[in-house]
Amino acid sequence: MSNKKQSNRLTEQHKLSQGVIGIFGDYAKAHDLAVGEVSKLVKKALSNEYPQLSFRYRDSIKKTEINEALKKIDPDLGGTLFVSNSSIKPDGGIVEVKDDYGEWRVVLVAEAKHQGKDIINIRNGLLVGKRGDQDLMAAGNAIERSHKNISEIANFMLSESHFPYVLFLEGSNFLTENISITRPDGRVVNLEYNSGILNRLDRLTAANYGMPINSNLCINKFVNHKDKSIMLQAASIYTQGDGREWDSKIMFEIMFDISTTSLRVLGRDLFEQLTSK
């Protein structure tokens, strides 16, 4: 479904206090920040906003940790490991908070992926394809690698009631609206969001069970079916819609929103620290 309003509403949904935005400061304004750097700024903002709590940032989680978390739920889980030092490394890293019992709990996991250079190629007048006579390049499947990290974090957080995994998408393979790009020779090329050649969003919506994109889905959803109650861990998937690059300030606001949602879910396990003088 084409939804230009989804892109426009991003700047309206995430209004933060001047104090939190101030964390961004001159440094952020002067740099094109990678998602990992934004995660570190979110961690700093959380520390300022909640001085009673301890936060940490790390760039990877070992597979042994994931298996240990699974074993705590059921001894039949987490028993297979072939490479002892294997780990996962989301490009935005992981932000955690220490709870009242001294355990580190995940409040944010972030990734940013770019796929599809059609907009840049058209603006530069480049033609693609085997014979160099096409405006559009058939989309690849590299983005599907994101499913691995999402699945691993879901395993790591299987005992939690929240899933703060956010995936930022940009590039011509993630359009949610039709756009027109002008070549240097003046010819206009139309990119249609529902083109099977271009769009790869449907390759990722399995990670959020087909729920809305550009939405904070951090709180796990419980659904009832017959005699079963099923917990859904949905990734929060954000796309610009028109293929452009993400503004790091908007990324910061979305990531801070998801982090504070995590803290609300974890509230009873943070109560002692939050109420201590």
UniProtKB/Swiss-Prot annotation:
GO terms for molecular function: DNA binding; magnesium ion binding; type II site-specific deoxyribonuclease activity. This is Type II restriction enzyme EcoRI. It catalyses: Endonucleolytic cleavage of DNA to give specific double-stranded fragments with terminal 5'-phosphates. The keyword Transcription regulation does not apply. Homodimer. The active site is at residues 91, 111, 113. Mg(2+) 2 binds at residue 91. Disulfide bonds: none annotated. Mg(2+) 1 binds at residues 91, 111. Its cofactor is Mg(2+). Keywords: Endonuclease, Hydrolase, Magnesium, Metal-binding, Nuclease, Plasmid, Restriction system. The gene is ecoRIR. The keyword Magnesium applies. It comes from Escherichia coli. Belongs to the EcoRI type II restriction endonuclease family.
